[in-house]
Amino acid sequence: MSEEFDESEIIFSDNYFPIRRREDGNEKENNRPVDFRENSERVWNKSSRRSKTTPLPSAVTAFSSSLPVNIPMRRYSTEEEYSDDDGGRKMIPPHLIVGRRMEGGQMAFSVCTGNGRTLKGRDLSRVRNSVLKLTGFLEA
């Protein structure tokens, strides 16, 4: 690479680089972007020769080829499409569900074996076996 660029020149550039066409037939150099510094030097050299009242020549305007084309209008929908159909049931908050299960003895504490204890040895293998049985990987 003969010339180094700053990151701001590449990523945050305010200019579009038009494609330079050459007549020599070299395909790699045919579609090479025009360098920003070359453009600015050409404009600066031309403008330095002219008087300050003469306007600068307008740069070749190029537009992005990735602009979206023929975007359909968004179809606005009614609330009926987004409504949740819960069958008329009333929602019960999760903390009430947990409280009811703890009172009735239905709450499962498969990994909670005590305060501050970690699962080791026989306790760990029991938990592992119960999980494998519940998931169907181990038959009872």
Swiss-Prot record:
Disulfide bonds: none annotated. One of its GO terms (biological process) is response to absence of light. Keywords: Cytoplasm. Induction: Slightly induced by dark. Triggered by pathogens such as Pseudomonas syringae pv. Tomato DC3000. Residues 16-58 are annotated as: Disordered. Residues 20-44 have a biased composition (Basic and acidic residues). Pfam families: Senescence_reg (PF04520). InterPro entries: Senescence_reg_S40 (IPR007608). GO terms for cellular component: cytoplasm. It is found in: Cytoplasm. The keyword Repeat does not apply. Belongs to the senescence regulator S40 family. This is Protein S40-1. The lineage of its organism: Eukaryota, Viridiplantae, Streptophyta, Embryophyta, Tracheophyta. The gene is S40-1.
